UniProtKB/Swiss-Prot annotation:
<dbReference type="Pfam" id="PF06418">
    <property type="entry name" value="CTP_synth_N"/>
</dbReference>
<dbReference type="GO" id="GO:0005829">
    <property type="term" value="C:cytosol"/>
</dbReference>
<keyword id="KW-0460">Magnesium</keyword>
<comment type="function">
    <text>Catalyzes the ATP-dependent amination of UTP to CTP with either L-glutamine or ammonia as the source of nitrogen. Regulates intracellular CTP levels through interactions with the four ribonucleotide triphosphates.</text>
</comment>
<comment type="subunit">
    <text>Homotetramer.</text>
</comment>
<feature type="binding site">
    <location>
        <position position="13"/>
    </location>
    <ligand>
        <name>CTP</name>
    </ligand>
</feature>
<feature type="binding site">
    <location>
        <begin position="186"/>
        <end position="191"/>
    </location>
    <ligand>
        <name>UTP</name>
    </ligand>
</feature>
<feature type="binding site">
    <location>
        <position position="71"/>
    </location>
    <ligand>
        <name>ATP</name>
    </ligand>
</feature>
<feature type="binding site">
    <location>
        <position position="222"/>
    </location>
    <ligand>
        <name>CTP</name>
    </ligand>
</feature>
<feature type="binding site">
    <location>
        <position position="351"/>
    </location>
    <ligand>
        <name>L-glutamine</name>
    </ligand>
</feature>
<dbReference type="InterPro" id="IPR017926">
    <property type="entry name" value="GATASE"/>
</dbReference>
<feature type="binding site">
    <location>
        <position position="222"/>
    </location>
    <ligand>
        <name>UTP</name>
    </ligand>
</feature>
<dbReference type="InterPro" id="IPR017456">
    <property type="entry name" value="CTP_synthase_N"/>
</dbReference>
<feature type="domain" description="Glutamine amidotransferase type-1">
    <location>
        <begin position="290"/>
        <end position="541"/>
    </location>
</feature>
<keyword id="KW-0547">Nucleotide-binding</keyword>
<feature type="binding site">
    <location>
        <position position="71"/>
    </location>
    <ligand>
        <name>Mg(2+)</name>
    </ligand>
</feature>
<feature type="region of interest" description="Amidoligase domain">
    <location>
        <begin position="1"/>
        <end position="265"/>
    </location>
</feature>
Length: 542
């Protein structure tokens, strides 16, 4: 039977619940247990698919096409389990489902209330998401005390009672600030945070004390005394120079032993040798490259969380320190390509909307004309095609219909029909809703032998995740190819362009899919690894 570890946060947000949860999950997995993770988001949006990257950060796409919270990216990078649409849900999704059942008459005329109807639906989804895992870690978004999270906290209170203390425990992350002028850590915020939890019937079993300084033994004893938590379960988690150290930090303090004993599980001791290798490669690089990343959302780098991590993973696999130079594409529009000078490679990620697109196109032109290694992702592929059409074909009005519906050469247009992951045909028009209407999830792609992308993957067919509603216009594709645009990857049915390359360029690859969603610190990703190798070759050539 599945054991549940519910994870909450207190005092302030952004303490790193997702990282801490994933790190514990990684240790339990290293002990031979089957582990899964869930993220419960209290906001009322149905999913984050239409939320601004400046507010929410990245939208992580699962294998089965769910648009989810970026924490699911952390989960997949730390454990081997593949997340699905069952691993993330929001208040909006819960209410949508309950109200649909009410409209159908499923509740037989009952008055619909938060308790029991909303809480029952939350519990049902937690159990479904946990599946047949030995241990399921369930992270509750937000901070204890927020009004939005109250139904979720009530639901886990009920579930703890229903499954019993041998199958459920609560891990609470809290801030233990260090006051430099006084030279001491303060435990009072933690005490009050636990008091808030206990007022709604939740007693923590584990406390993770986040701080920028070590939380000493006397402070941990004091916290244990005032919060009714075992002293061995009060864990100090200070800031580290790489998040991939955290499994080792938690293991060294015996957190996994406490969990295993509490649940009465029989399992092996943890083998964290893979994580030791990752940390060693990360902290002891043998080479160094600088890559210019030209994006639209540079004010909030969480909008590119998986991509930034994927570049770090590529550095790990190549024993190379990857310095990312973050450049706002609008700055290129205003200041020119001098911002790109000195970069060993150029990376243009995805995005939506007209703002900053011309700066991205200029960055592509700089990379192509100056033979600088280039990797384009999603919109990064579309702007590569637009740049080629304008500056090689001479179609100065070439554009995407996303940005100019009246373009005389719409080389990129809305996908109106495609087959989803199950083979069902989906259709869209300009009038379709924005939410949940993109080409989403894992799709097979046929790779052309002898291409740069084939050199990276070493396969004829690959599977990568997508999140887009625009594609290369097949009506203009023959002319583009005649002029030298190389199409090195197509969808399984051959209908959609997935990868393009530039002839007579040392390394120019642009893909419609999002390879960053499947990159992990232990295995890296072949495309990003190849990109960093190309950047190293460029640097050594200079």
């Amino acid at each position: 039977m599945t054991r549940y570890i519910f994870v909450t946060g207190g005092v302030v947000s952004s303490l790193g619940k997702g990282i801490a949860s994933a790190s514990l999950a990684a240790i339990l997995e290293a002990r031979g247990l089957k582990v899964t993770m869930l993220k419960l988001d209290p906001y009322i949006n149905v999913d984050p698919g239409t939320m601004s990257p400046f507010q929410h950060g990245e939208v992580f796409v699962t294998h089965d096409g769910a648009e989810t919270d970026l924490d699911l990216g952390h989960y997949e990078r730390f454990i081997r389990t593949t997340m699905t649409q069952n691993n993330n849900f929001t208040t909006g999704r819960i209410y949508e489902h309950v109200l649909r059942k009410e409209r159908r008459g499923d509740y037989l005329g009952a008055t619909i209330q938060v308790i029991p109807h909303i809480t029952d639906e939350i519990k049902r989804r937690i159990i479904k998401g946990a599946g047949d895992a030995d241990v399921a870690l369930v992270e509750i978004g937000g901070t204890v005390g927020d009004i939005e999270s109250q139904p979720f906290l009530e639901a886990i209170r009920q579930l703890r009672v229903e499954v019993g203390s041998k199958r459920a425990m609560l891990m609470h992350l809290t801030l233990v600030p260090y006051i430099a002028t006084a030279g001491e850590t303060k435990t009072k915020p933690t005490q009050h945070s636990v008091k808030e939890l206990r007022s709604i019937g939740l007693q923590p079993d584990v406390l993770i004390c986040r701080s920028d300084h070590p939380v000493d033994a006397s402070s941990r004893r004091k916290i244990a005394l005032f919060t009714n938590v075992e002293e061995r379960a009060v864990i100090s988690l200070e800031d580290v120079d790489t998040i991939y150290k955290i499994p080792g930090v938690l293991h060294a303090q015996g957190l996994d032993d406490f969990v295993v004993e509490r649940f009465g599980l029989q399992c092996n001791s943890a083998d964290l040798s893979e994580w030791d290798k990752v940390v060693d490669a990360k902290l002891n690089p043998e080479q160094e490259v600088t890559i210019a990343m030209v994006g639209k959302y540079m004010e909030l780098l969480d909008a590119y969380k998986s991509l930034i991590e994927a570049m770090s993973h590529a550095g790990i696999t190549n024993r190379t320190k990857v310095n990312l130079r973050y450049i706002d594409s609008e700055d290129i529009e205003n200041q020119g390509t001098s911002l790109l000078e000195g970069a060993d490679a150029i990376l243009v990620p995805g995005g939506f909307g007209l703002r900053g697109v011309e700066g991205k196109i200029t960055a592509v032109q700089y990379a192509r004309e100056n033979k600088v290694p280039y990797l384009g992702i999603c919109l990064g592929m579309q702007v590569a095609v637009i740049e080629f059409a304008r500056n090689v074909m001479g179609w100065k009005d070439a554009n995407s219909t996303e940005f100019d519906r009246n373009s005389g050469h719409p080389v990129v247009g809305l996908i109106t029909e495609w087959a989803d992951a199950t083979g069902a045909v989906e259709t869209r028009t300009e009038a379709s809703d924005l939410g949940g209407t993109m080409r989403l999830g894992a799709q097979d792609c046929q790779i052309v032998a002898g291409s740069k992308v084939h050199d990276c993957y070493g396969k004829d067919v690959i599977t990568e995740r997508h999140r887009h509603r625009y594609e290369v216009n097949n009506n203009l594709l023959p002319q583009l190819m005649d002029a030298g645009l190389v199409v090195s990857g197509r969808s399984e049915d051959g209908a959609l362009v997935e990868v393009v390359e530039s002839k007579d360029h040392p390394w120019f690859v642009a893909c419609q899919f999002h390879p960053e969603f499947t990159s992990t610190p232990r295995d890296g990703h072949p495309l990003f690894s190849g990109f960093v190798k190309a950047a190293l070759a460029q640097k050594n050539k200079a």
